[in-house]
Each structure stands twice: as structure tokens, then as C-alpha cells.
Amino acid sequence: MKKIVALLLALCMVFALCACGNSSAKSDDIHIGIVTGSVSQSEDDRRGAEAFQAMYGEDMVKLAIYPDNFTEELETTIQTIVNLSDDPAMKAIIVNQAVPGTTEAFRRIKESRPDIICIAGESHEDLPEIGSAADLVCNNDFVARGYLIIRTAHELGCDTFVHISFPRHMSYETMSRRVAIMKAACDEFGMQFVLETAPDPTSDVGVAVAQAYILEKVPEWVEKYGQNAAYFCTNDAHTEPLLKQLLEYGGYFIEADLPSPTMGYPGALGIDLTEEAGDYEKILAKVEQAIVEKGGADHFGTWAYSYGYTVSAGLAQHALNVIKGESELTDIDDISKAYQVFSPNAAWNGSNYTNAETGVKLDNVFLVYQDTYIMGDPGHFMGSTSIEVPEKYFTIK
């Protein structure tokens, strides 16, 4: 009898060790790739990818960077994304921001590796187009935000809204539709809407020249449009010089194109966030204090948690949850759950994207946004995620 019991115990131990071995193998067999821009072009996107890698390790999470001049180096951009699929253990590839070339890269990946989950964060390509190649697309809600940013500016007492961009960005459906929505919202709230053009930092002129242009023009714009004008730019590299000059000469800034307390504010304010890195509650508090000290209370806003950081890390987390069978790929609640890991106190809202031309809702394309926070003493949330956007804005194009 003792021999039988001993044999059974030995068998149990063998089965347990096998089970542990299989579990470990499953974990080791999951590789996730994240492709972002460089720190100079989109720091928050990159930092979010690094945070996810730090959480799960370099063996599991593989990072890549597409060229700064991605419009001129299209094939390099495509190949940077595709190269991740050469890894036999690769199970998901996230691209944030999904710059031109991402759709083609995903198509090439699917030809040889249809098992890889392809996810696009903040697509620069038309959403129906990239939605045809990606398994999931998540963009900021340009429809709702187009209305809500103007509504917030109106509530803060602004009488003019100045939109700064360049032809490449204005060729994107997301940005051109948002401009149309912003203009319509300005009409509704009795505000003047102005379009200003600035150099494209990814063109031959480069980042330095583009930023110098903003530094030079803002004083002229403030003189022209007055102290009650709110400003918005579509490019990350334009944000810091715009904030710097608005703090000096006056004006409002509701939130960045891709909002974050670290989007432009540290450089514009001359503050070091090294000690606060990754802790967005501390980052927001330090940025807010500096804004107040410079006399900018109630004039400058953001999202409490970085959009780019949350998208890079959150979409990777969502992919991992899906791979493990814990989430559904195209469930907005599951996507929000993954985002919450990296923005624990944020209020989010979102919905499926509807093609304005066809009226067709895309099941794998989502538009999301976070509540707007206006910095002050004290600062306050605007409650944007609980405001119902009038239906007419969803069909403006």
C-alpha cells in the first residue's frame, strides 16, 4: 500500500512539473512588438512602449522605431514594421502612431503570418483603408473632440479659435473632418474660426526650422487675434514652441492634438520631470504648479494621463489579454480595461467609427477620448466625457 501511495505522489509531482513547464513555455512563446516614432518626434508614444517592455521584459516585448522622416522613407517604415513578423514567436504587432505605410506593412505581414494580431494606434491613414488591413484600429475621437474642444474654449470665455497645421496633415480624413467639425462648432458658439499654416517638421525644412517659425509667428497671432483666442496645432513638434509663446504673450490652449501633461509643457516651462517619470499624477501636479506660477491658470489644459503613452502600452496590454483568452479583440470595454492599467484615474469615452461617406459603422475601428483637465489653482476636469455631442456633428465631412 505504501508503495502505491508513493507511486501516486511521484506521478502527481511529474504532472505538476509538466504543467508548470507548459505554462512557462506558453509565456515564453508570446512575443509582442511595438513600433513607435522616436523620442524627438513622439516621446510619449515611445515611453509607453518602454513602460510595457519594462513590465514584461525585453525577451517578450520587442521595440522598433520608424524613421523621423517617414513620409520620405516609406519603404524603410514598412520594412521596420514587417521585420518584427520574422520572429516565429511574434503574436501581435502594435504601431503607434500608425503613420503612412502601416496599412501596406500589415498586408504584407498577413500574407505570410495571418496568425499575428495587427493593431494600429492613432492612424495617419484613412480609417476605412487601414481598417481593411488591421485587426484593430484605435484613434482619438476626432468627431467628439472637434466639438468638445470648441465647447470648452467657449466655456472658458474664448471668442476665437486658431487651428495650426500643414497640407500633409490636412489631407488626412481624421484631421480634415475635425477641422470641419470645429468650424461648425465655432459657428454654433458664435466664435471666429481661423486656419493658420506652418512648416511640416517631417519635410526637408526639419524640426528646428518648423519650431522657429512657431516661435516667430505666435506674437503676431496674439496681436492679431487678441488675448481671448484659443490655439490648437496638429503636430507634436509645434506644441512646445506654441505653449512657450502663449505663456509669454497670452492666449488659451485647451489640449494638444494627442494630449498629455508631457506634450510640450516640460520644455515650454523649463521643468525637469526625471524624478516623476511614469507617474502622471505627480507629473500633472508639477506641470500645473509651473503653469500657475507663470500666470497661466485656467488658460491651459491637457488630459491627466498621456494619450500616446496610454495607447502604446494599453494596446499592447489589450493584445496580451486577447492572446491569453482574457479579452475580446473588438470589445470597447476590454480595450478600456487595458487602457485603465496605464491611466487608473482617467474617465474615458468612445465608440465605433462611422464612415461619413457611406454611413457604415466599422466593427474593428474605435474612436476614444479622455476628459479634459484645465490647470489652475485649483485645476478642474471639464466633464467632457459625460457631455452628449449633438448628432449632426457625426455626419459633417
Where in the sequence are the language-model features?
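Short, low-complexity disordered leader/linker segments with a strong preference
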Residues: M1-I30, K397
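Extracytoplasmic "Venus flytrap"
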Residues: D29-Q79, I94-P100
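Periplasmic-binding protein-like
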Residues: I32-T36, D87-A98, I116-G121, V162-I164, ...
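An alpha-beta-alpha
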Residues: A49, F142-L195, A319
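Flexible loop/hinge segments that line or gate small-molecule binding clefts
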Residues: R108-F142
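Hydrophobic alpha-helical segments within soluble ligand-binding/sensing domains
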Residues: L136-V162, Y213, I283-A290, S306-K324
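Extracellular/periplasmic periplasmic-binding protein-like sensory domains
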Residues: A185-F193, E240-K324
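Hinge/cleft segment of the Venus flytrap/periplasmic-binding protein
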Residues: L284-K397
